[in-house]
Design a protein with these regions (language model features):
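A glycine-rich dinucleotide-binding beta-alpha-beta segment and adjacent secondary-structure elements
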Residues: 76-129
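Generic alpha-helical structural context detector
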Residues: 24-28, 88, 126, 147
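Aromatic-enriched alpha-helical interface/lid elements that frame and gate functional surfaces
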Residues: 1-77, 81
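Flexible, small-/acidic-enriched active-site or ligand-binding loops
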Residues: 42, 107-154
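A generic structural signal for secondary-structure junctions
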Residues: 28-31, 95, 101, 151
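Residue-level detector of short coil/turn "hinge" positions at structural boundaries
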Residues: 34, 81, 103, 153-154
Length: 154
């Protein structure tokens, strides 16, 4: 703990602390080593018990800089974290481009007849993934889902 999204001075990041050592590094890197040295927060169990206080302190510190700063600083010390991207940021990501992970799917409602989707990151040499079903429109399957899950029909 913590394993969640945090606001920064500009865009959000996700932090995924997996052990007490990573928590100490997180606190040191954000300039708040006293959080980790508090006996109530020294262990994961203690942090879970005092979640609201821990999260409030971390949020306040992380709001002092932007996401690029924190992702670089925390990554440099081994604290798992990453940016929370918008869809346009996902499609512009250098790794997404390098791995050719953008798939243009035909879509009747799209302005140019196609909508970009993110490809499966797992690649099989003998059984490549096939993309056959276009993404649904908002509420396109709502009636079927309500009927299947709740037995209701509008």
């Amino acid at each position: 703990m913590p394993y969640q999204v945090f606001p920064t001075a500009d865009d959000p990041i996700i932090v995924a602390v997996g052990n007490d050592s990573q928590f100490r590094k997180l606190c040191e890197t954000i300039g708040r080593p006293e959080i980790a040295s508090n006996p109530n927060y020294a262990t994961n169990a203690g942090r879970v018990q005092h979640r609201q206080q821990v999260i409030a302190a971390l949020e306040a510190a992380l709001r002092t800089e932007g996401r690029h700063h924190w992702v670089a600083a925390l990554g440099a010390v081994g604290v798992p974290c990453g940016p929370v991207n918008t869809l346009s940021q996902v499609f512009e990501d250098p790794q997404v481009k390098h791995r050719e992970m953008v798939v243009a799917m035909p879509h009747a409602k799209a302005a140019d007849g196609f909508v970009n989707v993110l490809a499966n990151p797992i690649r099989f040499s003998e059984t490549p993934v096939q993309y056959r079903i276009t993404p649904p429109m908002r509420n396109e399957h709502a009636q079927e889902i309500l009927h299947d899950w709740l037995g209701k029909r509008n």
